[in-house]
Amino acid sequence: MNRKILQLAIPSIVSNITVPLLGLVDVAIVGHLGSASYIGAIAVGGMLFNMIYWIFGFLRMGTSGMTAQAYGKRDLTEVVRTLLRAVGVGLLISLGLWILQSPILRGAFVLIDATEEVKRWASLYFNICIWGAPAVLGLYGFAGWFIGMQNSRFPMFIAITQNIVNIVASLCFVFVLGMKVEGVALGTLIAQYAGLFMAFALWLKYYGRLKAYIDWDGLWGGEAIRRFFSVNSDIFFRTLCLVAVTTFFTSTGARQGDVILAVNTLLMQLFTLFSYIMDGFAYAGEALAGRFIGAKNDVGLRRCIRLLFLWGIGLSLSFTILYAFLGRDFLGLLTNDTSV
């Protein structure tokens, strides 16, 4: 069982760690363009997209659990329906984001105190990258579905490919074609759709036989769709609470001065690192527990929960000890400012 957990958790951890690299690459590129306003624009735009997409993370989490349950039951029709529902809901949400992009941007600038120059470049970045919403949310559905099918390697391959495409495209647009923030935004946009197309290609190649189980008539009706929205609404509100807490943490620190804000930002980096690793085991839990529930394997389910609980305790204690004794050293790698 531990082997199964690690086989699912480790690729998921790698995938999670690559997520912030997309934004980091953008910042690194504009950081060489000679204006701090470019960096500020990417920071503001990146933060805004992170909050938006984090809120809709239920498309991945809910999909993985429900796919795993259908897979455990060997109900291949419901397996396919779950993917189609997730991608369909993602496309509908994307349409809403497109329609509301101007109010969203104006609301963000009310909350974010930035210079007019930063707002101008951030608006350009946002108005380009928002067209990638279908790719991002659609990929959430595919990633959750792959994990539910006990396959966390495909999301890892997709995440790595996205980073490579983003780096190459952004470098070409900025340093070859002479673009600025818009070049970085276009590179990110291309990488997002490259990830979605890769997910679809992998699905066709390795799961194409499931096309025979597509049932359009039962896609949006019955108990299954009620459960789909019931589970995802719970996850949605849970995520809203997390976003509210982290936003409060950042905004409160900002009101207490630059030093406190900097300290809180560094501490959040340590917290984020821990979260990415723990989330890998959470994904493994979603896939395995869902499969055991679907197969009505109570013995396997109890053993899975017990082992995941032990992994959680072990990792929590390990990180607590690590941060307690080496916390200052980790912070020293992130900054040399003695006031922080």
What is the meaning of each model-derived region?
Residues 114-115, 119, 126, 133-160:
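Cytoplasmic helix-loop-helix junction between adjacent transmembrane helices
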Residues 3-64, 230-253:
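Signature of the first transmembrane helix
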Residues 39-99, 136-154, 250, 263-327:
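Small-residue-rich hydrophobic transmembrane alpha-helices
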Residues 9-12, 16, 43-46, 90, ...:
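Residue-level recognition of transmembrane alpha-helices
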